[in-house]
Regions:
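Periplasmic/cell-envelope proteins involved in peptidoglycan metabolism and beta-lactam response
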Residues: 1-286, 399-409
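Beta-lactam-recognizing serine transpeptidase/beta-lactamase-like catalytic domain environment
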Residues: 64-66, 102, 106, 207-211, ...
Length: 462
C-alpha cells in the first residue's frame, strides 16, 4: 500500500516535469520562429534595375545614327536618408549641382525608388568623385547615355525614349524594370532587340549585397542613307518656306513628307516627315510644356505612314492599268490609241436635264490625247470620261467598284507593313464604305450616299 502511494507520487512528479519540459520546448520553438521571422524581415532583398546600353542604330553605309555610351552618374541611396541627414544632402546637392531646380530636388527625396539618379558626373574629375562617395548615401554607377547623332534628321525613323506607360508595360514587360522604353520609330519597333537585359543591383537592408551585370542590346542596321535623308529634309524645309513666301495666307504651310525608295529593292532610303523633333531632348526627360507644344504642332505624326490623304494624280496609274486590262475607255473610244479632244472641261447631263461641268486643272485643255498622253500630261478630262462610262454602265452592280478592286490589288487600302510602329491603313472609298460611315460616322457622308461624282473624284486621286 505504501509502495503504491509512493509510486503514484513519483509518476505524478515525472508527469509534471515532462509537461514543464514540453512547455519550455514549445516556448523555445515559438521564440526561435519569431526571431527567425524578424531576421528574415531584416534580410529582405530588394532589387534596383539600371538599363544596359541599348543597341546602336546604323544607316546603310554604317554611319552611326544612334549611339550608346556608359558614363558615371551620381545616385542617392534613399534607404540611408533619414530625418537627421536629409537637409545635409539637400543642401549639398543644391550647392554642387545648381542646374537642378528645387522641384527636381524635392522629387528626388520623395521618390519611392531605392536609388535615384541625380546627375551625370562624366565631367567631374576623379578626386571630386571620390569625395562624393565619401558621403554614405551617395553611390556612383555607370549609366547608359543615348545620343542621336543627327538631332532632328531622321527623328521619325529612329524615334525617341521615355518612361513606360501602362500600355507599354503590356507590350514590353521586360522594359518596366529599367523604367525606359522606345516610344516611337525604330526605338519602339525593335524595343526587345535594342533594350537588352538590365543590370540588377540587389540590396540587403540599405547596403548593396550583389550586382548582376546586364546584357547590352543588339545593333540595328537600316536601309536609310543619312546623306540623302539630310538633303531631302533640307529640300522639304526650303520648299515649305518658298510656299509660304509665294502664297500669302493666314494658314501657313507647316507639314510635308518625302519618301525615297530604291527601285531595285523597294527599300526605303529616305523618309522625311515635317514638323519633326530632336530625340536628344527626351534622353533626360522633357517638360510637359515642351511635350505639349510638339504634340499640338503634329511633330509626333509620321505623315508618310500615318497621314491619310488623297494620293493625287499619281492614282491615275491605277486607272491607266484598268483601262488597259478591261478595255474601258472614254465614250466612243474602243482602244488606247484613239483620242479625245480635251478642251479643259467635261460637261454631261443628268436625267432631269441639268448639266454638270468638271473643269480640268489646265483651263485651256490638253488638246488631242490618248490613254498614254493623258497619263503623261495628267489630263483629268480623259480619266473623268472613263469614270463616267463605268458609272453609266455598272451603277448598282458589283462591277461598279472595278476601279477600287484594281486599286486594292495594287496595295491601296492596306498597310505596307514597314518596320515602324503605328502605321495607318489606307482608305479606298466605295459604296459599301459610305454605307458603313452612314451608320458609324454619319457626319462624314451626304444623305444620298455614294454617287458618280465620288467615283470621278477617286479616279484622279481626290
Amino acid at each position: 500500500m505504501f509502495f503504491q502511494q509512493k509510486f503514484r507520487l513519483l509518476a505524478t512528479l515525472i508527469g509534471l516535469i515532462f509537461l514543464t519540459l514540453l512547455f519550455n520546448v514549445y516556448n523555445l520553438q515559438t521564440s526561435d520562429r519569431e526571431a527567425s521571422l524578424v531576421s528574415v524581415k531584416k534580410q529582405t532583398l530588394d532589387t534596383f534595375y539600371i538599363p544596359s546600353p541599348r543597341g546602336e542604330i546604323f544607316d546603310a553605309n554604317n554611319n552611326k545614327l544612334v549611339s550608346s555610351s556608359l558614363e558615371p552618374h551620381l545616385f542617392l541611396n534613399l534607404r540611408k536618408i533619414n530625418d537627421n541627414n536629409r537637409s545635409q544632402y539637400e543642401q549639398y546637392i543644391q550647392y554642387n549641382f545648381v542646374d537642378l531646380g528645387e522641384d527636381v530636388i524635392d522629387e528626388i527625396f520623395e521618390s519611392e525608388d531605392l536609388l535615384v539618379r541625380i546627375v551625370n558626373i562624366q565631367d567631374i574629375n576623379f578626386d571630386n568623385r571620390q569625395s562624393l562617395v565619401s558621403l554614405e548615401a551617395f553611390e556612383i554607377f555607370d549609366f547608359p547615355v543615348r545620343k542621336y547623332e543627327y538631332n532632328n534628321i531622321a527623328s521619325h525613323i529612329v524615334g525617341y525614349l521615355g518612361e513606360p506607360s501602362l500600355e507599354d508595360a503590356k507590350d514590353f514587360p521586360l522594359s518596366i524594370n529599367p523604367n525606359i522604353v522606345g516610344k516611337s520609330g525604330l526605338e519602339r519597333y525593335y524595343e526587345d532587340d535594342l533594350a537588352g537585359l538590365p543590370t540588377e543591383i540587389i540590396f540587403k537592408d540599405d547596403e548593396i549585397a550583389q550586382i548582376i551585370m546586364g546584357t547590352p542590346g543588339k545593333d540595328i542596321f537600316t536601309s536609310l542613307d543619312i546623306n540623302l535623308q539630310t538633303i531631302a529634309t533640307e529640300s522639304l524645309l526650303q520648299g515649305i518656306e518658298l510656299a509660304n513666301e509665294k502664297y500669302e495666307t493666314k494658314n501657313k504651310v507647316q507639314k510635308g513628307a518625302i519618301v525615297v525608295l530604291d527601285i531595285r529593292t523597294n527599300e526605303v532610303i529616305s523618309l522625311v516627315s515635317l514638323p519633326d523633333y530632336n530625340p536628344n531632348n527626351f534622353v533626360d526627360g522633357i517638360s510637359q510644356t515642351d511635350f505639349n507644344k510638339l504634340n499640338i504642332s503634329g511633330a509626333f505624326i509620321n505623315y508618310p505612314i500615318q497621314g491619310q490623304y488623297p494620293p493625287g494624280s499619281v492614282f491615275k496609274v491605277v486607272a491607266y492599268w484598268l483601262a488597259e486590262q478591261e478595255n474601258i475607255f472614254p465614250e466612243g473610244l474602243s482602244s488606247r490609241n484613239q483620242r479625245i479632244n480635251c478642251k479643259g472641261s467635261l460637261s454631261f447631263g443628268f436625267d432631269d436635264g441639268s448639266q454638270q461641268v468638271y473643269n480640268d486643272w489646265k483651263e485651256d485643255g490638253h488638246g488631242n490625247v490618248d490613254l498614254g498622253s493623258s497619263l503623261k500630261q495628267s489630263c483629268n478630262v480623259y480619266f473623268w470620261d472613263i469614270a463616267l462610262k463605268i458609272w453609266r454602265d455598272y451603277e448598282g452592280t458589283t462591277a461598279e467598284s472595278i476601279l477600287q478592286e484594281y486599286a486594292r490589288n495594287l496595295g491601296f487600302g492596306t498597310a505596307t507593313n514597314i518596320d515602324l510602329p503605328y502605321e495607318a491603313n489606307g482608305v479606298v472609298p466605295d459604296r459599301e464604305l459610305f454605307e458603313n460611315w452612314a451608320i458609324s460616322q454619319p457626319e462624314r457622308v451626304r444623305p444620298e450616299g455614294w454617287l458618280g461624282g465620288d467615283l470621278m473624284n477617286l479616279i484622279i486621286g481626290q
